[in-house]
Amino acid sequence: MSKRDFYEVLGVPKNASDEEIKKAYRKLAMKHHPDRNQGDAAKPAEEKFKEAKEAYEMLSDPQKRAAYDQFGHAGVDPNMRGPGGAGAEGFGGFAEAFGDIFGDMFGGRRGAGGGRQVYRGNDLSYAMDITLEEAAKGKEAQIRIPSWENCETCHGSGAKPGTSAKTCTTCSGTGTVQMRQGFFSVQQTCPHCRGTGKIIPEPCVTCHGQGKVKKQKTLEVKIPAGIDDGMRIRSVGNGEPGTNGGPPGDLYIEIRLKKHEIFERDGDDLHCQVPVSFITAALGGEIEVPTLQGKAAIDIPEGTQAGKQFRLRGKGIKGVRASYPGDLYCHIVVETPVKLTEHQRKLLRELDDSLKKGGGKHSPSGESWTDRLKNLFT
């Protein structure tokens, strides 16, 4: 049976870049991996896996690819080459293409020279409540977060004073063990030492063998002006410590805006309810409204109705990524007077009688409302 074209196997054109070839191989290898195909699908998947591996090994090597492009399969056939020809390479190509994938999948990477696996520390989160004014202007704050320091009892070794850690006999100090499944070999974290390569027979009673103790430290945090609810600030390296010399995680500070007694935020805009007496709404006049920058004046036109919206440009918040501030929207709430005296009631009745004599012209919706009622009941 003749071999398929290597480019056809990977599904890439002949002028594909090295990165395109690598991505195509990754996709096929994950799809046809023996662990993902069981039963009747196992054998065909294994063949396709081997085929993709062979194609990648040839096309990922510049010299082999050049020979293949010029002579086809004959150019890379070991039976057609001298002693210096390509021989079996095991899983070299697979490890090269998938080393970073499996490193991320299991949370660890091999140290330099194939040593113990190192693990990045976990990220930490911290919720910070701030006021709307603080969000608008920005602020500097101090927060208390967990920190891990070397244990003073064992000086960071994790072992009881007078004793020492021993090399793990399961993994011979490498921190990893090899697991074979058919022809495929997988490297896993040693379950005995959990990737450290060391076993502590007598743990330190202070740190329980961890070598570090948890304490608290104060961190200075700068909150940028314009930050909004739900945004996060990243503090690099202030998360949990790594394992086996791995880098620490990061700290994420999540901002939570406190409810404001006057304003509601909508992106960079602000909204507020402005109460107005029905006299001012009817006759018009100037009123004062609050803003984050102080007081501002609004001219209320005669006959203003409840729900009328007034826009004050630039009186909102300048967001973190914004070039200019948002606006303030003032929503008019016409107040109905309460606890009236008898004299005040009499005056209002007289006003009501006078308005009724004018028909619907004194009410912006009076005539249309009356017409709709007539149509409904006729």
Curated annotation (Swiss-Prot):
Composition bias (Basic and acidic residues) maps to: 369-378
Q: Which InterPro entries match?
A: DnaJ, DnaJ_C, DnaJ_domain, DnaJ_domain_CS, HSP40/DnaJ_pept-bd, HSP_DnaJ_Cys-rich_dom, HSP_DnaJ_Cys-rich_dom_sf, J_dom_sf
Q: How is the cofactor bound?
A: Binds 2 Zn(2+) ions per monomer.
Which CDD domains does its entry note? DnaJ (cd06257), DnaJ_C (cd10747), DnaJ_zf (cd10719)
Where does the record say this protein resides?
A: Cytoplasm
**Keywords assigned by UniProt, alphabetized:** Chaperone, Cytoplasm, DNA replication, Metal-binding, Repeat, Stress response, Zinc, Zinc-finger
* Keyword match Metal-binding: yes
Q: Main localization of the protein?
A: cytoplasm
One family from Pfam that matches here is DnaJ_C
Q: Which HAMAP family match?
A: DnaJ
The record's domain comment reads: The J domain is necessary and sufficient to stimulate DnaK ATPase activity. Zinc center 1 plays an important role in the autonomous, DnaK-independent chaperone activity of DnaJ. Zinc center 2 is essential for interaction with DnaK and for DnaJ activity.
This protein's assembly is summarised as:
Homodimer.
Q: Could you identify this protein by its name?
A: Chaperone protein DnaJ
Organism of derivation: Paracidovorax citrulli (strain AAC00-1)
